[in-house]
Design a protein with these regions (language model features):
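Active-site-proximal alpha-helical segments within enzyme catalytic domains
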Residues: 1, 74-78, 109-118, 135-139, ...
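Peptidoglycan glycan-strand catalytic modules in the bacterial/periplasmic cell-wall system
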Residues: 1-151, 155, 204-206, 331-333, ...
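Conserved catalytic neighborhood of penicillin-recognizing serine enzymes
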Residues: 13-37, 170-178, 368-424, 484-515
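Extracytoplasmic/periplasmic proteins that interact with beta-lactams or build/remodel peptidoglycan
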Residues: 21, 25-29, 41-45, 101, ...
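Soluble, non-transmembrane domains of envelope/secretory-pathway proteins that act on or interact
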Residues: 256-263, 532-533, 537-703
């Protein structure tokens, strides 16, 4: 360990009450690069010292000598040292900057790479040629002083114009035109997490393995599906006009030239604003530079991103195996690498798309309700909170089926409370949600009112569970990863699964959510000639728009909204149209034929009154406006009644055959059977009475 250096750093830290002074030997630098986090603290420095001693002692014992241990440490250092642009190790740097192997570098080129290490963002040869040349000459002079090179070699290297044959600028241009797409970045993040969890690697080790380890990665991406999804997200015609504003994010790194310490002489800033033109964005950048830059604070790197304010994200999965086939984390062109992915990183409220998961799935799965079961739609209050239906109406006895396709809030909340918060919460955990907590054991969860929110990816996976007959697969971006020798490093091909719902429950939910598409709130998500089931969601003040749906082949979820969480103006079901467009194209491209959702054993049908959902009375088939007896699914082991008894909504009324009012003493009369809601309105009465029918009004009596 560099004892003198550590003592110098400690003295400086005590004097300044900070821990920014670095004093690392190669061993400690390797540990910093490979194992330890970047936090600057005394505890981390102590860890470095302890691990450095332990590592050197272990290597001396294993390799037989201190000299062999030092050579091994040097090799590790040269293979892991950061050399700007995300490069790790001298081989990667040689390839990037000069297009050759490290062993093929000239002395001048090698010295320029060696010089990068002090402050990579300043001394990289493609960043600042003047500073890079100065550093290169420092390295060459030190080598000459140590008699590692001759004067002639020094003179030749000093005269060589290494900048004339840099290849990195062309490489950078190619890379900027071929940024990692949304899928590749999501796959890298999952692989990194799995390396840390399953191989006990640190974050630094996992990153080095991915980018410098020569891995062969097999992803689950379907290229044509990814292209289709990205194309839709880039098509401005698919989106509402909005307010014409654009979000600006300006990232800037500033070098303090008066601070010689390489570990703390840079500051990084993220500045944001909203503009209506590129000129405004450029003016904003100029103002930030004027604020941050001066004679002693120089620009290292900066990056400007201008994006449409109204954003969207989409995920497409194969529900049969959990494979993610396509993912898009934002609208328009992807602004760069390692950018915010709204499909995996944004936690948003999901609105009514949470109703089937938090309320109806547990209720049906535990045998409390069936599609034809009746719940009274009426004003209710829970703990001071009174949920209201989106249309402001209450219609009395209503079936679960109608509650889903008409997206009725009161029915969902009543169902959630019937199930119990603890049970509902456990089902959500089983559906794979990782960002919910005990605070979500609340009635608001039935309507998607979560403490933190959930990601589009996890919500899509939950719907894929229903589409897959109730069996959950964790979303998977890769199938297998091989190391540089061809050995299996990570294997996702046989993923563990667990059952969340009975097959019968999954089918009943699917059958009810088909009605969302055929006659409910999701008609704009229909796919011509293909069965679709799904659920729409809208949060308060139209801040978030969501839809999660599936065919017998694929499950897809879409979110639309502003990062700033403001109201979406004139949305006009744009998210549903995008979903339908993307999924229609995918099924067409693959030549997929329509087929039914697979119906499991254990289901039968039961006759019910189509108005009340109860067991039909003798009057039900005589409804004046057409409500009659229908049937709906129940499980064969269902013990309860779908409506708690025989229909009480249908009653016979004597009316005036001329006015449609209740008959007076002298009126010509006729008897009609009507289903009457709890508020006295007639259920099923059309706004425009058909020809040949009376406009019946039972709230008035004919004179």
């Amino acid at each position: 360990i560099d004892i003198r250096g550590i003592m110098r750093a400690m003295a400086e830290n005590i004097k300044t009450m900070s821990f920014s002074q670095g004093a690392s030997t190669l061993t400690q630098q390797v540990l910093k690069n490979e194992v330890l986090e970047r936090e600057k603290s005394l505890s981390r420095k102590i860890k470095e010292q302890y691990l450095a001693v332990s590592l050197e002692n272990a290597l001396k014992k294993q390799l037989g000598s201190k000299d062999a241990a030092k050579k091994y440490i040097l090799e590790l250092y040269l293979n892991t040292i950061p050399l700007h642009h995300g490069l790790r190790g001298v081989e990667a740097a040689a390839q990037y900057y000069y297009g050759k192997h490290a062993s093929e570098l000239t002395l001048a080129e090698a010295a320029s790479i060696a010089g990068i290490t002090k402050t990579p963002s300043l001394y990289a040869p493609d960043v600042n040629q003047e500073a890079s040349k100065e550093r290169q000459m420092t390295v060459l002079k030190k080598m000459l002083d140590l008699n590692m090179i001759t004067q002639a070699e020094y003179d030749e290297a000093a005269a060589e114009d290494i900048y004339a044959h840099l290849v990195c600028k062309e490489t950078a241009e190619e890379e900027s035109n071929a940024k990692h797409n949304w899928f590749v970045e999501a796959a890298v993040q999952q692989i990194k997490a799995d390396l840390m969890e399953k191989k006990n690697m640190t974050a630094a080790q996992a990153s080095n393995m991915i980018y410098s380890g020569g891995l062969q990665i097999h992803t689950t991406m379907d290229a044509s599906m990814q292209e289709t999804a990205e194309a839709a997200m880039k098509n401005d015609n698919m989106f509402p006009a909005g307010d014409g504003k654009m979000d600006v994010t300006y990232l800037i790194s500033v070098l303090d030239t008066q601070n010689p310490d390489e570990s703390s002489n840079q500051s990084h800033y993220e500045k944001k604003t909203t503009v209506t033109s590129q000129a405004e964005a450029d003016a904003f950048v100029a103002s930030v530079k004027e604020e941050l830059l001066d004679e002693t604070h120089t620009l290292v790197l900066d990056k400007l991103t201008v994006s449409k304010s109204l954003q969207a994200a989409m995920v497409i999965m194969d529900q049969s195996n959990g494979e993610v086939k396509a993912i898009v984390g934002g609208r328009g062109e992807k602004p760069g690498d390692s950018v915010f992915n709204r499909a995996t990183q944004a936690l948003r409220q999901q609105g009514s798309t949470m109703k089937p998961l938090a309320a109806y799935a547990p209720a049906i799965d535990t045998g409390l309700l069936m599609p034809g079961s009746i719940i009274i739609d009426e004003p209710v209050t829970y703990g001071g909170w009174s949920p209201k239906n989106w249309d402001g109406k209450y219609i009395g006895p209503t079936t679960v089926r109608q509650g889903i396709w008409h997206s009725m809030n009161v029915l969902a909340v009543k169902t959630f409370m019937m199930v119990g918060a603890d049970t509902a919460y456990q089902y959500l955990l089983d559906f794979g949600f990782t960002t919910i907590d005990e605070r979500d054991k609340a009635a608001t969860t039935a309507l998607g009112g979560l403490t933190q929110g959930v990601s589009v990816l996890e919500q899509t996976a939950a719907y894929a569970t229903i589409a897959n007959g109730g069996t959950y697969y964790e979303p998977m971006f890769y199938s297998v990863v091989y190391d540089h020798d061809g050995n299996v490093l990570l294997d996702n091909s046989e993923q563990e699964t667990h059952r969340v719902l009975k097959e019968t429950t999954a089918f009943l939910l699917t059958d009810m959510m088909r009605d969302v598409i055929t006659k409910g709130t999701g008609t704009k998500a229909a796919i011509s000639g293909m069965n679709v089931a799904g659920k729409t969601g809208t949060t308060n003040d139209t801040v978030d728009l969501t839809f999660y749906g599936y065919t017998p082949y694929y499950t897809a979820g879409i979110w639309m909204g502003y990062d700033s969480q403001k109201e979406i103006i004139n949305a006009n079901n744009a998210h549903l149209r995008i979903w339908s467009s993307v999924m229609s194209q995918i099924h067409y491209d693959k030549g997929l034929k329509n087929k039914e959702f697979e119906k499991p054993d254990g289901l039968t049908t039961r006759s019910i009154c189509s108005a009340s959902g109860m067991t039909p009375s003798s009057l039900c088939n005589s409804d004046y406006y057409g409500y009659g007896v229908t049937s709906d699914y129940v499980t064969t082991d269902f013990k309860g009644g779908t409506g708690g008894g025989t229909c009480t909504m249908h009653k016979s009324y004597t009316i005036c055959s001329e006015t449609g009012k209740l008959a007076g003493a002298t009126c010509p009369t006729m008897n009609v059977v009507l289903a009457v809601n709890s508020d006295g309105t007639i259920k099923g009465k059309p706004s425009k009475v058909p020809e040949g029918k009376l406009d019946i009004n039972i709230s008035a009596t004919c004179d």
